[in-house]
Amino acid sequence: MTPMRITVWRERLQQMRPQRKLLKQTQQRRLLHQLQQRKLL
């Protein structure tokens, strides 16, 4: 691998991390919402 490719790869990784965090947060919220609905029912 050339140094250039490595830097590009690193940048991509850094960009993907926040997206993953957001994904996890939305999933957790959805789960919480479902649980609350079940309790109401």
UniProtKB/Swiss-Prot annotation:
Protein origin, superkingdom: Viruses
Function per UniProt: Involved in viral RNA replication.
Protein name: Replication-associated protein
Organism: Potato leafroll virus (strain Potato/Scotland/strain 1/1984)
Source species taxonomy: Viruses, Riboviria, Orthornavirae, Pisuviricota, Pisoniviricetes
